[in-house]
Amino acid sequence: MSGAPVSRGFRGRRGGADAAAAARVPPGQHVTTDFPVLSAGPTPRTRVEDWSFALQFGGSLLAKWSWAEFQALPQTRITVDIHCVTKWSKLDTEWEGVTVDALLAAAGLDAPPAPFAMPHSDGAYTTNLPLADMLGGKAMVALRYGGQPLAPEHGGPARLLVPHLYFWKSAKWVRRLRFMERDEPGFWESLGYHTYGDPWREQRYEGD
């Protein structure tokens, strides 16, 4: 979107492009130029006319936007590296969407109402996140990838993007963000995946 702020990913120090790229890849990962498609279930095909996004705390609905209303919120473009728990990394991926900070501001919230959040997606997928990992420009609801509307197989029409954690935390087909007083496991976390998922510490599974 024209006029949107742009944040570029780390470009490395002097010493050669290969060395710079290697420094951006967490241990145990390999770089791919493809964009593998991995999902916990079938790919939902949600029409934008039927799409909405909400913020919730307890039994209270804090804010809700239609697709058109969400498109009108401040948009941010970023270029980041992403890292999947299945050991692939993709460098310099370009995304555009609405940061969680902008969502809170649009909802009239000076601060998040609780320290944790659970994104909820079409297909009943969930994952848990500390709010500290979603603020300060660290996370967004992404609507576009590579300058194009986000394809359904990659989470479109909208997915969460939390690029500093393993990519299962970047929930596809996201529809709601539920704030929580206490941390709760999401879909994969309930099946033994790590509750946090830091790729630089190889936190793939519980106990890592």
Residue locations for each model-derived region?
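Structured, non-membrane catalytic/scaffold regions adjacent to prosthetic-group chemistry
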Residues: 3-208
